[in-house]
């Protein structure tokens, strides 16, 4: 209890080191939005020549109040309280509320898929926007091809170093982002003095007035560009477990002030230069003196790389959580760092690299990428709001307060979603298609698990204890292994999969000193590591339930070593003396793991939809990792056996013996 209380204190406590870590991990995406957000707003109005004072004030006001209502109110003040044992993100939120309604898995899948799709586009748009600052350096910039090649090289380097972990360069993230936000704040403050009337934008009147003003050429759809300023808000919630709530509470005011100052500085510059004709204007770089541009390009590129790294790492975490929640197939996961949160998934890394590079080559400029950027993340935010509503209900908040919060958020985010729909034909359809593909895989994987559970037959192990005891003493069979371990996906008290007992007794009688039946249960808590043992009133049958958090590695052999030691020390399991061993006094025998895989066979009587789901799953499994690596069995003795999933329509085919004499010449011989 004391350790839990101490952990709660550290989670809610803010430190100077935690402040820097938060800057480096949490705010990369939202912190780089000044690179391109104002550029998109100006372009939507038709360029600098078409800007009026009321438009500029209204646009900056929309930026300020979007950051306030969505990022500050929804995520910092409300969502950060919805932590699952100090972990945040849409899947952590889902595990908190999934018992309230079965259908809540739908917004969880949609939100997770769109967040992954957004994670592929963000590195492309942030790095490209930073490199495009070279347009102000004439002796460096030649054409857009230079920007594209430079961007592709940086992205290639970024994805190639993922296998080594981010801990080494990660130590620099915080200080670099502190410099970045300091630059945003100072430069924004200085440029605000170009026209101090920009401070009027704090008044929300200008934001509301712009939405209905005839001067606003984009009309309601300007919200599609405005939303770019808060696309990183979801990442803020997802990274809760990495930095703690206290550090976010302390660091967000600093970050928000710096970002708002940057937008105000850009707005003041626009006020001072409105009416001018400047091609391909990016206010972020336009406010800078010419001799500073190259240095700011370098700094902004570093900030963009850090933002991209945070999203890549976040994608790895998101996929690993989805796997443990049985929403995605198994992928090989490596842990290159020394901390629990550092992981690397080669398949996901390669997919992100290819997709991000495709976006750079397809869209070519940040201008075209921005058009496709915000739609997916608006969907994610709407799904998070749906889950958040049920969390507030679960916590017993007054219904009036819940209605006020939920309706308000749905109206605001729904407006951004509707405004972003126009971007569908401008390239957002690609991101939506990627999200739909991920949703399809999630649906197939989740549904197939439920179908398999329905068809797996169970037997009461108590009815077979005598046979197992007789087999272990039957010396007419060679000793298969001292310990035989079966991993089972379904184990309810004394009931286990029929296929397992068939494997032990029928397929090839497996004589062993001890039979282990292990079931891994993923808990709603992220870092649970517990087990429960039932010896079935014997000293040779061990039922083990492993309770592992959804962020824990499912490395069964390592946990079994601890369990065996505990059972022998408590006297529940006899010591297994080994006559031959390089380890003096070894008291534990050898182990063999048997993985029984159900294959779809004889499924003619299965409903067509279920057959389609299982056949699709089988095709997907061909390109995913095997259970052997997932459960950490690659260095153990393993046997993989295949059994048919459906046996209901297996019957003898009707055939009769021919009794009369047959002239064999009637049947022509076949060659």
From Swiss-Prot:
<dbReference type="InterPro" id="IPR023051">
    <property type="entry name" value="Kup"/>
</dbReference>
<feature type="transmembrane region" description="Helical">
    <location>
        <begin position="18"/>
        <end position="38"/>
    </location>
</feature>
<dbReference type="GO" id="GO:0015079">
    <property type="term" value="F:potassium ion transmembrane transporter activity"/>
</dbReference>
<dbReference type="InterPro" id="IPR053952">
    <property type="entry name" value="K_trans_C"/>
</dbReference>
<protein>
    <recommendedName>
        <fullName>Probable potassium transport system protein Kup 2</fullName>
    </recommendedName>
</protein>
<comment type="similarity">
    <text>Belongs to the HAK/KUP transporter (TC 2.A.72) family.</text>
</comment>
<feature type="transmembrane region" description="Helical">
    <location>
        <begin position="402"/>
        <end position="422"/>
    </location>
</feature>
<feature type="transmembrane region" description="Helical">
    <location>
        <begin position="218"/>
        <end position="238"/>
    </location>
</feature>
<keyword id="KW-0812">Transmembrane</keyword>
<dbReference type="InterPro" id="IPR053951">
    <property type="entry name" value="K_trans_N"/>
</dbReference>
<keyword id="KW-0630">Potassium</keyword>
<keyword id="KW-0406">Ion transport</keyword>
<feature type="transmembrane region" description="Helical">
    <location>
        <begin position="343"/>
        <end position="363"/>
    </location>
</feature>
<dbReference type="GO" id="GO:0005886">
    <property type="term" value="C:plasma membrane"/>
</dbReference>
<dbReference type="InterPro" id="IPR003855">
    <property type="entry name" value="K+_transporter"/>
</dbReference>
<feature type="transmembrane region" description="Helical">
    <location>
        <begin position="149"/>
        <end position="169"/>
    </location>
</feature>
<feature type="transmembrane region" description="Helical">
    <location>
        <begin position="292"/>
        <end position="312"/>
    </location>
</feature>
<keyword id="KW-0813">Transport</keyword>
<comment type="function">
    <text>Transport of potassium into the cell. Likely operates as a K(+):H(+) symporter.</text>
</comment>
<feature type="transmembrane region" description="Helical">
    <location>
        <begin position="60"/>
        <end position="80"/>
    </location>
</feature>
<dbReference type="Pfam" id="PF22776">
    <property type="entry name" value="K_trans_C"/>
</dbReference>
<feature type="transmembrane region" description="Helical">
    <location>
        <begin position="103"/>
        <end position="123"/>
    </location>
</feature>
<keyword id="KW-0769">Symport</keyword>
<dbReference type="Pfam" id="PF02705">
    <property type="entry name" value="K_trans"/>
</dbReference>
<keyword id="KW-0472">Membrane</keyword>
<feature type="transmembrane region" description="Helical">
    <location>
        <begin position="173"/>
        <end position="193"/>
    </location>
</feature>
<feature type="transmembrane region" description="Helical">
    <location>
        <begin position="252"/>
        <end position="272"/>
    </location>
</feature>
<feature type="transmembrane region" description="Helical">
    <location>
        <begin position="424"/>
        <end position="444"/>
    </location>
</feature>
<dbReference type="GO" id="GO:0015293">
    <property type="term" value="F:symporter activity"/>
</dbReference>
<keyword id="KW-1003">Cell membrane</keyword>
<keyword id="KW-0633">Potassium transport</keyword>
<feature type="transmembrane region" description="Helical">
    <location>
        <begin position="373"/>
        <end position="393"/>
    </location>
</feature>
<keyword id="KW-1133">Transmembrane helix</keyword>
């Amino acid at each position: 209890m004391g350790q839990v209380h101490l952990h709660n204190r550290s989670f809610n406590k803010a430190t100077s080191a935690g402040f820097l870590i938060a800057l480096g991990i949490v705010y990369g995406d939202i912190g780089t939005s000044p690179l391109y957000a104002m550029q998109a707003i100006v372009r939507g109005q038709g360029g600098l020549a078409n800007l009026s004072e009321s438009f500029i004030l209204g646009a900056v006001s929309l930026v300020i109040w979007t950051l306030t209502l969505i990022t500050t109110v929804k995520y910092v003040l409300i969502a950060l309280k919805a932590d699952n044992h100090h972990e945040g993100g849409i899947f952590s939120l889902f595990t908190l509320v999934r018992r309230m309604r079965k259908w809540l898995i739908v917004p969880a899948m949609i939100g997770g898929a769109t967040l992954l799709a957004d994670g592929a586009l963000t590195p492309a748009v942030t790095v490209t926007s930073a490199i495009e600052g070279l347009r102000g350096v004439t002796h460096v910039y030649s054409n857009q091809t230079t920007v594209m090649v430079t961007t592709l090289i940086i992205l290639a380097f970024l994805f190639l170093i993922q296998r080594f972990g981010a801990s080494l360069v990660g130590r620099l993230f915080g200080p670099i982002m502190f410099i970045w936000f300091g630059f945003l704040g100072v430069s924004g403050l200085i440029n605000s003095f170009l026209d101090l009337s920009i401070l009027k934008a704090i008044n929300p009147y200008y934001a509301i007035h712009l939405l209905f003003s005839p001067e606003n050429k984009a009309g309601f759809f300007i919200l599609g560009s405005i939303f770019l300023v808060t696309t990183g808000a979801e990442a803020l919630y997802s990274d809760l477990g990495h930095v703690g709530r206290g550090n976010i509470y302390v660091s967000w005011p600093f970050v928000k002030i710096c970002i708002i100052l940057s937008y105000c500085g850009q707005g003041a510059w626009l006020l001072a230069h409105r009416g001018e004709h400047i091609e391909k204007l990016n206010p972020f770089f336009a406010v800078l003196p010419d001799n500073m541009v190259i240095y700011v390009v370098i700094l902004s590129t570093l900030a963009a790389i850090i933002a991209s790294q945070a999203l890549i790492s976040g994608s790895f975490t998101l996929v690993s959580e989805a796997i443990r929640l049985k929403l995605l197939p198994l992928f090989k996961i490596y842990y290159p760092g020394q901390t629990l949160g550092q992981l690397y998934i080669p398949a996901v890394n390669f997919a992100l690299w290819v997709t991000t590079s495709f976006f750079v080559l397809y869209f070519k400029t940040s201008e075209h990428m921005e058009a496709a950027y915000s739609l997916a993340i608006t969907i994610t935010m709407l799904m998070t709001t749906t889950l958040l509503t049920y969390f507030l209900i679960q916590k017993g908040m007054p219904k009036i307060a819940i209605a006020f919060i939920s309706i308000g958020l749905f109206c605001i985010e729904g407006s951004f979603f509707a405004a972003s729909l126009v971007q569908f034909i401008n390239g957002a359809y690609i991101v939506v298609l990627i999200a739909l593909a991920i949703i399809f895989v999630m649906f197939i994987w989740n549904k197939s698990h439920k179908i398999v559970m329905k068809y797996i037959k169970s037997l009461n192990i108590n009815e077979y204890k005598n046979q197992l005891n007789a087999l272990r003493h039957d010396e007419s069979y060679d000793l298969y292994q001292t310990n035989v371990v079966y991993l089972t996906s379904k184990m309810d008290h004394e009931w286990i999969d029929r296929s397992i007992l068939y494997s032990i007794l029928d397929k090839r009688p497996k004589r062993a000193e001890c039979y282990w039946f292990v079931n891994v249960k993923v808990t709603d808590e992220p870092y649970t590591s517990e087990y429960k043992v039932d010896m079935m009133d014997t000293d040779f049958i061990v039922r083990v339930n492993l309770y592992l958090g959804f962020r824990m590695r499912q490395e069964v052999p390592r946990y079994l070593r601890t369990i065996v030691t505990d059972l022998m020390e408590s006297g529940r399991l006899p010591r297994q003396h080994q006559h031959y061993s390089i380890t003096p006094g070894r008291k534990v025998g050898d182990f063999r793991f048997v993985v029984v895989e159900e294959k779809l066979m004889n499924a003619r009587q299965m409903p067509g939809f279920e057959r389609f789901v299982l056949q699709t799953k089988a095709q997907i499994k061909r390109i995913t990792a095997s259970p052997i690596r997932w459960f950490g069995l690659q260095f153990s003795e393993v046997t993989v056996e295949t059994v048919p999933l459906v046996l209901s329509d297996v019957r003898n085919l009707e055939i009769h013996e021919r009794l009369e004499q047959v002239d064999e010449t009637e049947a022509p011989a076949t060659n």
